[in-house]
């Protein structure tokens, strides 16, 4: 491999894409887009970090896709597949997969540069995928006579569809009960989720697309010596990067949302620990009502923290009395809420407590972040060991 020749060929390919191929398909030639793509390619070839400001209308998505494709086609070093693309919006993830990459593949194949399409896959967290074992159990439990027909049809559709986001009319209740659990030790050879993970680990996809949460989660796993979420890779493209710090702050910290408390109460009722559920419902009532209100910027976080006094007394009692009797899921839910409440009622000086909008409800949620968050992001994401 001649490094200098490949570097030159990669840059020539970018010029060819933006000066010849895309204009032939009705797209305007934009000098700023070409310069941006060359700058991105330089960073990829040199293994550097590049912070690229792309104004509206420049065409940043094609700029980084062209640069990544050129870097892969003409490597100047060891390029580890896949190339990771992280965005903050589902709409952009779908657009990259369904619109941008198919068109780029089409024109490059028509020109003889590629012999097969650029392959990509969207990666998501476990809660977005169905667990075959839990789905079978749920279908056995459901009352066919009382179940909403659309919700029942959605459940049955999951027998053929792994990604639950692609199934309409699936209730939140059913979704929680059939998704892949956070602790998954499935040994089934025919498990669709495990087969999907194995496929993603193979050298099959040039691009793996994810949201910022999954990107940060992978970085945290690697920093803690845990099994990585993504295969080894040498190029990361962070689109909508202005939203990465907020995501990292949440991922590296602790949150307490009303939904977590309500789910715990519901689970206690399902396992017939009605007194414990009633105690928790009573002690968390004022907090839940507060979190249901839209977040006010000027209101101090102490207004919410004061409402944790009662739950901080109730939760340890529940833990002592029935903690060892709960199902694994119930135990994890109880421990998660208990640990969060302990943190928010502690006097740790190295933590920053604040409220943030809970986008799922329109209300607020409690957040705790380490005071050295900038250094932690730098260490796990930009300067890993």
Where are these regions (language model features)?
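Segments forming glycine/polar-rich beta-alpha architectures that bind adenosine-containing cofactors
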Residues: 337-385
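A substrate-engagement module of RecA-like helicase motors
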Residues: 2-23, 28-31, 75-208, 212-213, ...
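N-terminal pre-P-loop "Q-motif" helix
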Residues: 27-44
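Walker A/P-loop
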Residues: 46-67
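Signature of the SF2 helicase/ATPase Hel1-core->accessory helical subdomain module
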Residues: 64, 70, 91-94, 98-102, ...
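Hydrophobic positions in the central parallel beta-sheet of the AAA+
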Residues: 50-52, 85, 208, 236
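Short loop/turn elements that form and flank the Walker-type P-loop nucleotide-binding site
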Residues: 45-46, 79-80, 202-205, 230-232, ...
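Walker A/P-loop NTP-binding motif
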Residues: 41-42, 61-78, 99-103
């Amino acid at each position: 491999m001649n490094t200098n020749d490949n570097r030159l060929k990669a840059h020539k390919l970018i010029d060819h894409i933006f000066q010849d191929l895309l204009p032939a398909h009705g797209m305007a030639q934009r000098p700023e887009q070409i310069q941006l793509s060359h700058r991105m390619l330089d960073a990829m070839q040199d293994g550097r970090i590049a912070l690229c400001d792309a104004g509206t209308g420049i065409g940043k998505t094609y700029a980084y896709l062209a640069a990544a494709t050129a870097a892969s086609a003409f490597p100047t070093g060891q390029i580890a597949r896949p190339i990771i693309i992280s965005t903050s919006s589902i709409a952009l993830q779908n657009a990259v997969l369904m619109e941008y990459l198919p068109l780029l593949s089409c024109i490059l194949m028509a020109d003889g540069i590629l012999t097969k399409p650029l392959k990509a896959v969207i990666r998501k967290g476990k809660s977005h995928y169905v667990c075959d074992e839990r789905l079978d159990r749920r279908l056995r439990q459901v009352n066919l006579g009382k179940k909403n027909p659309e919700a029942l049809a959605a459940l049955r559709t999951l027998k053929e569809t792994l990604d639950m986001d692609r199934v309409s009319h699936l209730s939140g209740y059913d979704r929680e009960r059939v998704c892949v659990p956070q602790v998954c030790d499935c040994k089934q050879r025919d498990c669709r989720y495990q087969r999907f993970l194995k496929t993603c680990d193979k050298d099959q996809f040039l691009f793996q697309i994810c949201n910022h949460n999954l990107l940060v989660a992978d970085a945290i796993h690697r920093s803690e010596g845990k099994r990585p979420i993504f295969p080894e890779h040498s190029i990361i493209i962070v689109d909508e990067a202005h939203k990465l710090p907020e995501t990292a702050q949440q991922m590296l910290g602790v949150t307490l949302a009303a939904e977590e408390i309500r789910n715990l109460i519901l689970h206690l009722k399902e396992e017939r620990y009605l007194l414990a559920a009633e105690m928790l419902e009573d002690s968390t009532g004022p907090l839940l009502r507060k979190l249901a209100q839209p977040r006010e910027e000027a209101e101090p976080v102490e207004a919410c923290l004061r409402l944790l006094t009662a739950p901080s007394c109730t939760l340890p009692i529940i833990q002592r009395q029935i903690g060892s009797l709960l199902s694994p899921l119930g135990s994890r839910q109880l421990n998660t809420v208990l640990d969060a409440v302990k943190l928010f009622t502690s006097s740790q000086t190295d933590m920053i407590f604040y409220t943030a909008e809970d986008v799922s409800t329109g209300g607020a949620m409690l957040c705790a972040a380490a005071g050295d968050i900038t250094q932690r992001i730098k260490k796990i994401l930009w300067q890993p060991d």
